[in-house]
Amino acid sequence: MIIADTGFWLALFDRRDNHHQAVRAFFVTLKEPFITTLPVLTEVCYLLQTRCYPLKATDFLMAQQAGLFHLFTISEDHLLKMSQLMIEYADLPMDLADASLVLLAEELGHGRIVSTDRRDFHTYRWKNSEPLSNLLEGVL
């Protein structure tokens, strides 16, 4: 499964996004399923509602229901690790959505991600030392 960040979803669903064409072209070539987290889902819905129009967020939610991506469940046990990550990367700063994706990489055992946020995801490490591999690196 490919981990998907907020920027990827925004570029895919918002035709006015600067990365829409590149992300859309990349998206149609992929055969692997996507996975994301509830903090990312929340962030995407909020931004689609404010950047596009209120019902655009429902398109995103319906896409999940149609099987476009899986949703990783964050438990209470994960909150300590996410807060530790946010402290470690406070200088960027790391938000809850990003912390949830680094945690997801640790849970999946790989750091393959799609994100338009190249700076932060180039800096973050899963398992404290493993770099994330942004599959959009050569596309954007």
Language model segments and positions:
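Active-site neighborhoods of divalent-metal-dependent phosphate/nucleic-acid chemistry enzymes
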Residues: 71-116
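Alpha-helix/helix-capping structural signal
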Residues: 7-8, 39, 77, 119
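Acidic active-site catalytic centers that drive phospho-/nucleotidyl reactions
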Residues: 5, 43, 98, 117
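Acidic, PIN/NYN-like endoribonuclease modules and their adjacent C-terminal/linker elements
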Residues: 108-140
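Short, conserved active-site loops that position catalytic residues or coordinate cofactors/metal ions
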Residues: 37-43
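Short, well-structured N-terminal submotif of metal-dependent ribonuclease cores
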Residues: 1-36, 49-62, 139-140
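Short, hinge-like loop/turn segments at secondary-structure boundaries
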Residues: 52-55, 90, 129-133
